[in-house]
Amino acid sequence: MSTPCSGNEPATPTNTSPNNETSNSCLSMGVGVASNETNSSRELKIFKKVIRDPVLRAPFQEFLEQQFCAENLNFYLAVEQFKEIQDFQERSSFGRRIFDRYFAMNSTEPVNIDNSTSKRIRETVESGGFPLDTYDVAQYQILHLLKYDCWPRFLRSTNNSQPSFTDEELAADDEDKNGHSQPTSLNNTNEFEAAAQQSQPAPNAPAATKEKPSKQYSMPAEMTSPVKKNSLSPTHLRRCRPVEPKHCQLMIGDQFNTETVTLSDPTMSVRRWTQEMADAQGMDRMHVEVVDAETGSTIDPARQAIDALQSRALRLVPVVSFIIEFLPANFSFKNPASTPTKLVCIRARHSLSTGAVLRPLLHKYTLDPQVTRIVLNGSLEQVKRSCAVGQVSQKCLTVMSEAQYSDRVNAGKVSLPPRDPILSQLPSTIYEQNNFPFHQNGDISYCEIPNESERNKHAHLQHDGPNAAHQQKEYTLSIFNKFVRKASHAVSKSDPNPSAGTSQDRMASGVYSPATGGPSFASRAAAGTNFGGSANQVNAGSASTSSNNVSEPSKNRLSIFKSKTEKKVVKPESEKEKLKPRSDDIPTTSTSTPMAVETKPNGSRTTEEPLKRMGKSGDDGSQEPQGIRHPAIFSTKIGDEAAAAAAGASPSTSAPSTSTSVQTKTTTSPTKSPTSTTITTSGTTTSATSSVATAPPPVLHAMRSASTPATSSQLTGGGGGNPRESSWQTAAYV
């Protein structure tokens, strides 16, 4: 197989060396070894000389930036700089920055390398060590991509030929680089296999030739140099010429003197670099931008990295900020609050004209520049389009149509107040306080200001942490207070009602329930509960017991009821209505807790106990509580009138002599003891005991059946008769 290859190779003794396998592989691709090997090596030397020279590299780098693949060249140059660092700490820091920029998960400029190489680099970085050969394999792959893919496209696009250098110049460059000369063949598609084959000695080779390949390292073929023996040492393999750092020419303001600024940090953005330069020059970092001194165009600080400033003449110029209000087509000055307007904050250089600044915004909001007027906000003073924006600094402009301007003139008002409170603030402080995002559009940068409702809605998110927490706390407290005010109106049945003692209508309505939570008299009467006894019979013992618990405030409230009830006029009722049982009157008491009442099995009570209590309470000399009547309680006066009417209506059935004996036992005490009244008419005795106190006390009201009247024996003795009629039941705790 070496015969066909020998015809194309020069007759040298080296043809019998292990390089025959490499030459055979080259021949299998149909390429001559000597000529192509020499040409490929020379072209690669020329290419490496071009990318290492900043002047020669600038057009090629600009082409890569246009093709969005400049990260490959940046990575190659960064690795060259990484190899020159001897200090371990500095090399580790720089190596970490290279990894974060080109190989990390969220890297800004990822390079196109194979997965195995990327995995090997990641493992090396995670181990904490950054040897000098950390990125050698990746650098070789990127160099191969640049040489055989990007460089030919660059030559075809510019219609230029490859630069030519003499052999002495290339040799001098090889002497400077020492160890970065080209491999014997770059036409092989797998240089790693070729390097591995060269490192294995041939079986029939002399012993002297085994030592030379044994010193080969499993490095990319580009990194090996078979020319010199001393170039095979690891230290000499990594020796290269220092790469010149990136730099730019900077001019300040309108000055013509320039200074060279080194672009040392490749990860820095244009915005950050501009702010640092402004701080160094004593300028306002928030009101400055960098422009190209040759073209006068503004460099986008948000989208471009610091590599875009390399080898360029730059100028650092101040900018001015102002607000423009755009009125929509349906805006009317008669009702300005009905239609919201668009507020835009603009940053531009002082020398730009107002028309040039507004032109891209008018196209953005579909406004015709020919039929629009520019006036100062709140006035009728027009601003010419040729006026420089530096003259309208810190002011607000309004853009409106011709028809709106005519309506504004016809309105007769020379000045109008600002429609948005933010218009009264300084434009320079608006985006500093609210951190609005700016967008670059040519030579201007702008941000759309949200309306007042949106700003107030998200106000707690636009301030710092303590202010946001304080506003959130106030907002929570306001909601809590609103809930408390609404919930405070709801009163459960178990809560005492403070207005129960002052409202006569509530007490007379019959639906008021006491504080104990028991059912009212009206609810029990509506449910059809059977109440035994007479409607005019009241348990005197329980009334006297509960009346002892009446406090002084209850006595004071009683005077109000006394004055009201005395003035109330009772309409005269007919004889039939008077004879009917008054079951609609509902006894009502104060909110004092009722006391339990012991009852006999037959429902009656002993006569000694109420008399004894009445005797005890009668020792005091308080006034007799006569004349105090509550509209919801049967009084003795109503009972007397009913008894007299009944006696006069039936003279035939009554005895010849009607004796009415009224026996009243009144005892006075500090708690107003009850009054007992007994009425006897025509052999029928009706006993009614009513409890009258300073405040309506808890009353146990008992009713008997309307069909059968109660006899005196049933009331006093409690024996005989129908047990249903003689039984007493508790009516209600009212």
From Swiss-Prot:
TM region positions: none
Listed GO MF terms: GTPase activator activity
Keyword Nucleotide-binding assigned to the entry: answer is: no
Where are stretches of biased composition, namely Polar residues?
Answer: 180-191, 494-506, 538-557, 705-715, 724-734
Disulfide bonds, paired cysteine numbers = none
Which domain of life does the UniProt lineage start with?
Answer: Eukaryota
The keyword Cytoplasm is assigned to this record: no
List compositional bias (Basic and acidic residues) regions by residue number.
Answer: 563-585, 606-619
Q: Where is this region: Disordered?
A: 1-24, 162-236, 489-515, 538-734
What's any GO biological process attached to this entry?
Answer: negative regulation of signal transduction
Q: Which UniProt keywords apply?
A: Signal transduction inhibitor
Q: Where is the composition biased (Acidic residues)?
A: 166-176
Span of domain RGS: 46-157
Low complexity: compositionally biased ranges: 8-24, 194-208, 642-694
Database matches in PANTHER family: REGULATOR OF G-PROTEIN SIGNALING LOCO
Its protein name is Regulator of G-protein signaling rgs-6
Organism of origin is Caenorhabditis elegans
- Gene giving rise to this polypeptide: rgs-6
